[in-house]
């Protein structure tokens, strides 16, 4: 399928509406809940789905800002052509519903942690979204990002969580903003690593709060394992898009092409590490192999899709890799 086609295939509407990301986040959250034997409040599940959906919608709106829809892929073109409806109707409704869920259904401590993570997501969007306006957004965002980090340090959450989130925020500012505003710079920090990290932190936050309280360590083994999985998912997609001539300038193939060429080895190495975690789970897993087994199954499916990538378009590859994320969770939850 050409990148300039405007018709969205029936099987791709989930992606066009950005529903794949909240689905993946919620399913892996439920797997974590099963692994830790935690019964989540409905508001926590709905809240995660809503916030991930909102972030992805905003990201795609910003990516298409100031760009001719005919030059975008079908996913971003959909948002560019329906910008007003989405901006003035869909986004306010989603934000209002999310605020109601957050204020009425989520414990206060978790709400503050979510707010801290949301500020880091804003830094990420300022760093990597809005393709046509990244330079001036970098200048403005550097100061806004610093303010966000200072706000995180003042929130009523544990010092350990504060320091970890503030550290991630500072890293994102340095690698995301400051490297971009240098005119003519061709090497920055790829977005996949930070995007995968934020997605993993958001997915695991609710479980860690109920399992360990508001003093939870954000970068737990659960979060690190999911970080690796989600990052490899994003890098694989970027590699396929780059090979088709449709890659992003902030992706691994563009910034670190040497690493993109080693994707199969990266995937294999992390698969081996995860397999070891399944055989000999650390004490921090409490002897529960459920999460590493689900991650291992997903990695194996990713490897299978990668082998047949030459038969895929960038869009169909996205769909298949998202299925590689979804199917193991369904297996765990139904078994």
Where do the language-model regions lie?
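Interfacial loop-to-transmembrane junctions
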Residues: 140-143, 250-262, 300-328
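Hydrophobic alpha-helical transmembrane segments
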Residues: 2-5, 9-55, 69-70, 88-124, ...
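C-terminal ends of transmembrane helices
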Residues: 56-69, 122-133, 174-191, 234-246, ...
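Short juxtamembrane and helix-loop transition motifs at transmembrane-helix boundaries
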Residues: 5-11, 70-82, 99-106, 129-132, ...
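Cytoplasm-facing juxtamembrane segments at the starts of transmembrane helices
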Residues: 134-141, 186-197, 255-263
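Solvent-exposed interhelical
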Residues: 56-92, 227-269
């Amino acid at each position: 399928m050409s990148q300039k086609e405007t018709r969205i295939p029936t099987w791709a509407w989930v992606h066009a509406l950005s529903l794949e990301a909240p689905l993946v986040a919620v399913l892996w959250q439920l797997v974590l809940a099963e692994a830790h034997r935690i019964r989540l409040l409905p508001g926590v599940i709905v809240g995660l789905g809503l916030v991930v959906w909102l972030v992805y919608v905003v990201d795609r709106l910003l990516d298409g800002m100031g760009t001719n829809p005919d030059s975008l892929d079908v996913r971003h073109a959909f948002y560019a052509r329906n910008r007003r409806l989405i901006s003035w109707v869909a986004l306010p409704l989603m934000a209002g519903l999310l605020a109601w869920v957050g204020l009425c259904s989520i414990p206060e401590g978790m709400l503050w942690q979510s707010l801290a993570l949301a500020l880091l997501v804003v830094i990420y969007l300022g760093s990597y979204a809005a393709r046509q306006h990244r330079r001036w957004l970098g200048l403005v965002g550097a100061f806004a990002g610093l303010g966000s980090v200072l706000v995180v340090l003042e929130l009523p959450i544990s010092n350990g969580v504060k320091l970890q989130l503030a550290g991630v925020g500072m890293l994102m500012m340095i690698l995301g903003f400051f490297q971009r505003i240098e005119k003519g710079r061709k090497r920055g920090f790829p977005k996949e690593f930070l995007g995968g990290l934020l997605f993993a932190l958001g997915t695991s936050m609710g479980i860690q709060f109920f399992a360990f309280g508001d003093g939870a360590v954000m970068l737990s083994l659960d979060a690190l394992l999911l970080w690796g999985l989600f990052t490899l998912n994003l890098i694989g997609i970027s590699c396929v898009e780059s090979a088709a001539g449709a890659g992003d300038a902030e992706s691994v193939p563009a910034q670190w092409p040497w690493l993109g060429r080693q994707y199969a080895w990266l995937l294999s190495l992390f698969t081996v590490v995860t397999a070891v975690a399944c055989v000999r789970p650390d004490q921090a897993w409490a002897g529960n192999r459920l999460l590493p087994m689900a991650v291992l199954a997903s990695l194996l499916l990713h490897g299978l899709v990668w082998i047949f990538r030459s038969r895929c378009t960038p869009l169909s590859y996205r769909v298949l890799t998202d299925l590689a994320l979804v199917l193991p969770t369904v297996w765990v939850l139904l078994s």
